[in-house]
Amino acid sequence: MPKKDFYEVLGVEKGANDAEIKKAFRKLALKYHPDKNAGNKEAEERFKEINEAYQVLSDPQKRAQYDQFGTADFNGGGAGFSGFEDFDLGDIFESFFGGGFGGFGGSSRRRNGPQKGPDVQYSINLTFNEAVFGVEKEVSITKSETCETCTGTGAKPGTNSKTCPKCNGSGQIKVQRNTALGSFVSVNTCDMCGGKGTIISDPCSDCKGKGTVRKQKKIKVNIPAGVDTGNVIPIRGQGEAGVNGGPPGDLYISVRVMPDPFFKRRGDDIYIDQHISFAKASLGTELKVKTIDGEVKYDIPSGTQPGTVFRLKGKGVPHVNGRGRGDQYVNIIVDIPKSLNQKQKEALFAYMEASGEIQSSEKEGFFDKIKKNFK
């Protein structure tokens, strides 16, 4: 039976580097692992081939011999798992089962080292003007902070933590199991120290050995001009306290802007409706237009039609953390009066006659009808 090409088994080129080989192995090991293919003999054999290929190609000396002689006869090494100590199987199972797959270690190897604290999320409501022009706000949050009494060690001042006798300070316990596939070494979090590698025999009275305490803290937040609903403002180092001397997490302020009854916002542009009489729309006029900066004068031409939109350049919302501003758009609404006095009726009738909408001979009868309609 011809020997299989280990490069073909892993699906990589002969010139593949270590990272490419490891990536290919992870993908295939996840796909064909016996735990995922219970009772599938074909998958079990495939997994053995994948493991054997990886054992050879991941070892520079074995790979060199394999490339030169086309064989990897290393004392009948087979498909055992003894070479997996340098490969974190937890990475594979975390990607399949989610974070922290028990029994394989993964991130547990790093639990006794410094870790950044969790981030904190906070929502804040702003008025329309606060969002447009920017504002300084003070928020009050409850979060964990490093205990000042023990400076985060968790131990009573004047005492020290001790190395865990069960894991000898590593924070993890290795368990070797013999299976049909070979010798399998798994890494578990030490149940005595919780993965920290140390044990506190005399805990701090303030934090009860945790190294952190819950506190309410007031933080001033500078809201930049131009923010809008959905924007998130990061504040570095104001999250939960770090673990094992790690830095604190970050605070993320989520913005929600309350609507304004007059101004409508779309991005950095502002839209308003401007009501004018049909006479002013016909003759043209100077309007006093309300903007976020106050009133401005704007001339509209004669014959302006309902629905005409004028642009006031640079009168919109400031761009966040940038130069310039959006624009303001003015939508013209022509108001038609629901009632007219006698002089207004006569003026309109004169307009109709002047524009040829009625003939002189129709004047008396038509005017009588108009008078009846407006009584």
Swiss-Prot record:
Co-factor binding comment: Binds 2 Zn(2+) ions per monomer.
GO MF term list: ATP binding; heat shock protein binding; unfolded protein binding; zinc ion binding
Gene3D superfamilies: DnaJ domain, Heat shock protein DnaJ, cysteine-rich domain, Urease metallochaperone UreE, N-terminal domain
UniProt record, GO biological process: chaperone cofactor-dependent protein refolding; DNA replication; protein refolding; response to heat
Residue stretches of each CXXCXGXG motif repeat: 147-154, 164-171, 190-197, 204-211
InterPro entries: DnaJ, DnaJ_C, DnaJ_domain, DnaJ_domain_CS, HSP40/DnaJ_pept-bd, HSP_DnaJ_Cys-rich_dom, HSP_DnaJ_Cys-rich_dom_sf, J_dom_sf
Chain sites annotated for binding Zn(2+) 2: 164, 167, 190, 193
GO cellular component terms listed in the entry, alphabetical order: cytoplasm
Pfam families membership: DnaJ, DnaJ_C, DnaJ_CXXCXGXG
Subcellular location(s) of the protein: Cytoplasm
Broad class of the protein's primary localization: cytoplasm
Assembly and interaction partners: Homodimer.
Annotated function: Participates actively in the response to hyperosmotic and heat shock by preventing the aggregation of stress-denatured proteins and by disaggregating proteins, also in an autonomous, DnaK-independent fashion. Unfolded proteins bind initially to DnaJ; upon interaction with the DnaJ-bound protein, DnaK hydrolyzes its bound ATP, resulting in the formation of a stable complex. GrpE releases ADP from DnaK; ATP binding to DnaK triggers the release of the substrate protein, thus completing the reaction cycle.
PANTHER family: CHAPERONE PROTEIN DNAJ (PTHR43096:SF48), DNAJ HOMOLOG 1, MITOCHONDRIAL-RELATED (PTHR43096)
Family the entry assigns: Belongs to the DnaJ family.
Name this polypeptide is given: Chaperone protein DnaJ
Gene expressing this chain: dnaJ
